[in-house]
A protein has these predicted regions:
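Helix-breaking motifs and short loop linkers at transmembrane-helix boundaries and internal kinks
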Residues: 11-17, 214-215
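Cytoplasmic helix-loop-helix junction between adjacent transmembrane helices
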Residues: 15, 21-62
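Helix-loop-helix hairpin linking two adjacent transmembrane segments in secondary transporters
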Residues: 46-47, 54-102
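Juxtamembrane intracellular "pre-TM" segments in multi-pass secondary transporters
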Residues: 103-134
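Pair of pore-lining "gating" transmembrane helices in MFS-fold secondary transporters
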Residues: 127-144, 234
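Helix-to-loop junctions at the C-terminal end of transmembrane segments
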Residues: 180-194
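A late C-terminal transmembrane helix in Major Facilitator Superfamily
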Residues: 249-285
């Protein structure tokens, strides 16, 4: 489906065909995300699952940062259709790798599902623990989407960066997210998932403080410098890298026998909730940086609410595999 959608986009002759092709690509990406996340849940648990989810989320979050840079270079060199032909070839490569190396991960006792699992979705959504951690992911994604949406105006209009400089700053932050994700994955075995959630929450708060400090304590000219925006964003993105792996593993942990359904629901809450939070922030009639600071503060609050100090000892021990 992804290759078909990419080829349709490359061959599009009108807006309807182009938008339809992008929708087809979106559906196929959702399917692959569910497979990846449910496969991790099938094979791993505890800190190992958190490390794998952290890597997956780090990879997912680097794409919005690097895609404009790579796509822009391809489009400038070969025309606007070139990025979509590249995606079609990339999809073919991934298909070959799946056929060669991806085994079946589903446990033998997986619950069979016929049709749309609406009842399963509703039952999982009623689990307050699931919602706590799924909403942590939604908040982190909302922060990322808000940052991405506001960046062109803040960096190019206010800070005066050229398109190339903007792409480099964007790409550098993408590599930063991946680097912090790798670091978080390395230390999670030593400090545990609750500590990583706490670190992520504090980094979100630091990003919020940085934006507010720039808005209230610096002169207007200095406020528009690109680093005044990107340094707090870098802190918040580091917080995202620390939070999303543990939060995803906690959300999926009780659903070993229906990992696919739970993974799909985590993805839906993450993307839909993140998009709603981002749209709400951008709709506020205030300074864009202040909108982003509010989102960071909301993610900090959500992360703090998910920490074990706010749960009973018995429920936390049961839910987090003996606190690890």
């Amino acid at each position: 489906l992804y290759m078909l959608g990419a080829a349709m986009a490359a061959l599009a002759v009108d807006p309807v065909m182009f938008v339809s092709s992008r929708l087809l690509q979106g559906v196929s990406v959702c399917c692959t995300a569910v497979v990846a996340f449910s496969g991790v849940r099938d094979r791993l648990s505890g800190n190992e699952a958190a490390r794998a989810f952290g890597f997956l989320n780090g990879t997912l979050n680097i794409v919005p940062a690097l895609a404009p840079l790579l796509g822009g270079l391809l489009a400038e060199a070969f025309g606007w259709r070139a990025p979509f032909w590249f995606l079609a070839l990339y999809g073919l490569l991934v298909l070959v790798l799946i056929i060669m190396f991806l085994p079946e991960t589903r446990p033998a006792n997986t619950q069979p599902i016929n049709g749309l699992p609406i009842k399963n979705y509703l039952r999982i959504l009623r689990d307050s623990r699931f919602l706590v951690f799924a909403l942590v992911n939604a908040g982190a994604m909302g922060m990322a989407l808000t940052y991405v949406s506001l960046a062109p105006n803040v960096l190019m209009v206010d800070a005066g960066l050229s398109p190339l400089q903007f792409s480099l700053a964007f790409g550098a932050n993408g590599f930063w997210i991946m680097a912090v994700s790798f670091f978080a994955n390395r230390i999670i075995q030593k400090v545990g998932r609750p500590t990583c959630l706490m670190i992520g929450s504090l980094l979100m708060a630091l990003g919020c403080f940085g934006l507010l400090f720039g808005l209230t304590q610096l002169s207007v000219d200095v406020q528009h410098h690109w680093l005044v925006y990107m340094l707090p964003v870098a802190s918040a993105c580091a917080g995202l890298a620390f939070m999303m792996g543990p939060a995803t593993s906690y959300a999926l942990e009780p659903y070993a026998n229906e990992a696919g359904v739970a993974s799909a629901l985590v993805g839906f809450v993450q993307m839909a909730g993140g998009a709603a939070l981002g749209l709400l922030a951008m709709a506020l009639p205030i300074e864009p940086k202040l909108s982003l600071a509010i989102v960071m503060l909301a993610v900090y609050w959500r992360g703090k609410r998910a920490e074990p100090v706010n749960m009973s000892a018995a429920s936390w021990k049961k839910y987090t595999n003996n606190g690890k």
